[in-house]
């Protein structure tokens, strides 16, 4: 039994039956502390996920859990309406005995979910089929929530994908140059400025109503999709801490940014970095097959723009952090954030080089 926290006392607060057998660290997440709980319920082992919420990153736990409660309940009802299996196809919160969605113990905040049996998350793509199935899962997630009023959600990370605001932050970092690094990255600074027209591509369309406000996941990587152990199919989307109002183009674009790179996100040698157009088409096919008619034509036409925009924005954030002294993203070596930024910028250049083909794949 892991003894990091008073697990018996914490678990006792939740509405779970049986006696506690074990509570051990689980998974490879970096934001929250995740544990697999095993209970003995009349001789039958039952599993749950217990998480200690990172309230340094998410200080307003009430708002965080408000979002998760609304989204998981809406997903559950949507799955039931379609004759699905809600305990396997979406996250299910376990309430505390007093009806709350989380509990606090010694200044630490905990929540509990039903453990989804017979499914696994993967840190990297084993073959293109995995990427396709992650696209299906995120497309289905968007489809399940298509009728949800996204204005009900709080922005737990304000202006997270407001690229105009990100650009303003970047310009301030360049002007202040608190670490004296601006001169060495002058070419990268000029590169970002020369493509600043990208900043308003999506956010302005949301403001004008051309693109609808949707529930967005905001961390659409493969490791946030549970794949069925038996079939390999995308089963459920997890890690809902960053669900907020936004555009489907953001979620689609972030998946492409992360998954269609021939190299690691922090590859120092940009000669190894290439945009994998075939994987882009694979993901697009899976996503559109699952999102169905819930996506508008305007959204469809802007999916390629979302891919370019999210990659540009991410690279700009890495460069901003480098200029500010590496205070946001965890680094493991000198110039780590600069290497990350250059990787993203190389991807943007390659995306733009074949951009005329990207919208055609949507048709």
How would you describe each model-predicted region?
Residues 1-24:
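Juxta-kinase regulatory segment immediately upstream of eukaryotic protein kinase catalytic domains
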Residues 59, 227-295, 328-337:
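Active-site Asp-x-Gly
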Residues 9-10, 140, 191-198, 282, ...:
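Amphipathic alpha-helical segments that form well-ordered structural scaffolds
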Residues 17-20, 45, 232-234:
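A broad structural signal for short, well-ordered beta-strand segments within beta-sheet-rich domains
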Residues 24-28, 51-62, 119-132, 147-217, ...:
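ATP-dependent phospho-/nucleotidyl transfer catalytic cores
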Residues 3-4, 68, 280, 341:
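A structural signal for well-ordered alpha-helical scaffolds and beta->alpha junctions
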Residues 22-40, 45-172, 246-248, 259-260, ...:
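Conserved ATP-binding subdomain of kinase catalytic cores across diverse folds
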Residues 165, 281-359:
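Helix-rich C-terminal or lid/interface subdomains of diverse kinases
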